[in-house]
């Protein structure tokens, strides 16, 4: 009996050790974040955007898919939010969101992204609405002389085993994600993301968003726990002009796609 118990304990210990295989490391000692990452199967299904329904009487509300921002908007932003509908969403025209490709909150919507890491750069590729980010990790400063862009200018640094990505210099033409929702931002947007590979199969991602022209306080994005996907290459799911036109047409037929 004692022998059987000892064998069982050893078996469980071995299984636990196997399940918690440490994160791989680069030659320089930093964790290797490379791999295809997704939310796994244990996350709740994200809410579906509302279908056409009668508008309530009174002032136009902030559409449900932008409610996440309501506690953060300043008064000017709240006024603007009430005038915008789905048809104003630039992601329906195949434009990327401000977080770039590995959007912390977009994983709630099933985003799949691939990370490729070298000693000087971390490259992040998105499967949906394909785009990419090239993040230098060699200590260089922001390229303030570059024109603003939808992905901004990102630089990375290591804080222990955590990759910290600081992104500034955004244009105000695209929108940002908020826990699966989308809304506008200004050119003062500043995002700090943190990527920590806990073990071989698990990575935590979190971020803090600041935008003094739109938000009254920083928005701290809920931490996401991602899993290493059982495949090593993403697909290229193009957002084409035909798909974009269909999305815009559908948005224009809902009440939330119409300005009051």
Report residues per predicted region:
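PEST-like low-complexity, intrinsically disordered acidic/proline/serine-rich tracts
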Residues: 18-260
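Short, linear, compositionally biased motifs with a strong N-terminal bias
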Residues: 10-11
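Positively charged n-region of N-terminal signal peptides that target proteins for export
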Residues: 1-5
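N-terminal signal peptide c-region/cleavage motif recognized by signal peptidases
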Residues: 14-16
């Amino acid at each position: 009996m004692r022998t059987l118990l000892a064998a069982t304990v050893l078996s469980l210990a071995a299984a636990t050790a196997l399940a918690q295989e440490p994160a791989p490391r680069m030659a320089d000692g930093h964790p290797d974040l490379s791999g295809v990452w997704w939310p796994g199967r244990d996350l709740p299904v994200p809410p579906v955007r509302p279908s056409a329904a009668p508008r309530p009487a009174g002032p136009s509300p902030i559409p449900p898919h932008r409610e996440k921002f309501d506690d953060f908007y300043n008064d000017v932003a709240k006024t603007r939010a009430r005038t915008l509908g789905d048809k104003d969403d630039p992601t329906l025209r195949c434009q990327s969101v401000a977080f770039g490709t590995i959007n912390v909150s977009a994983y709630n919507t099933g985003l799949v992204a691939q990370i490729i890491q070298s000693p000087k750069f971390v490259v992040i590729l998105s499967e949906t609405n394909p785009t990419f980010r090239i993040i230098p990790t060699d200590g260089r400063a922001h390229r303030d002389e570059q024109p603003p862009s939808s992905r901004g200018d990102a630089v990375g640094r290591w804080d222990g085993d955590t990759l910290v990505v600081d992104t500034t210099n955004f244009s105000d033409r695209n929108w940002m994600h908020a826990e699966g929702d989308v809304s506008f931002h200004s050119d003062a947007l500043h995002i700090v993301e943190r990527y920590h590979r806990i073990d071989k199969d698990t990575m935590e991602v979190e971020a803090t968003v600041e935008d003094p022209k739109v938000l009254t306080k920083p928005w701290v994005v809920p931490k996401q726990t991602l899993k290493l996907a059982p495949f090593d290459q993403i697909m290229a799911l193009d957002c084409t002009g035909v798909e974009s036109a269909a999305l815009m047409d559908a948005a224009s037929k809902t009440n939330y796609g119409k300005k009051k």
